[in-house]
């Protein structure tokens, strides 16, 4: 297997995009890449993107560790494994069996369909309530054939306008140029890839030297639900942060998604996240 520093243009581009948004400098000189093949054939270069982003995350964590007195570290990333981790649910097993025991991840309500005007929309009914709302709107059975027939009744813009009004997880497939001209795309392009906001109270609790993990002593309240938010909080927990996940005792989720995003966290069950969020956050500890 070929091992080298980050040299692939897309890997470097992803790394530098994150690095340029940070308030401190990071360096990829101590990162090695195992150039393993992609695990899926796709025109989307997800593996190289993942390598760049995960390398930047590793550099950031290593920097924070050194600031807090931990020794410098090196990092080796496997390109194929980085791609797998973008869909880490497939790496979870229970008593030797994959936790993805059914077809929920590839059900017809998770798909891309052609509209009346020849464009395409993508929908994702990953959680039960999202699936049910999509089925109610399209008034169809949960099959690819039924979804395609229902989607073809309207134009892409008509469907997206309805989706916005009804809070449905659906959007039009757009080119990069179309996204740049769209209000949402323009707003995104106007902001840095990472935003930092402060409450002007950060000096009340200053972290000292770390003994074992770079983020030990960091306290996090997680009020997110789906995938991205829990995944981010899981990354913090992996590096030593004390993460409390607030969730209802009986929730609308899919077991593999919940398990994948809950490693290393404490679970606080509440019937209302709004009530939990209004609590003085220090009372959780």
Question: What is each stretch, according to the model?
Answer:
Residues 1-250, 278:
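Acyl-CoA thioester-binding alpha/beta core of soluble enzymes
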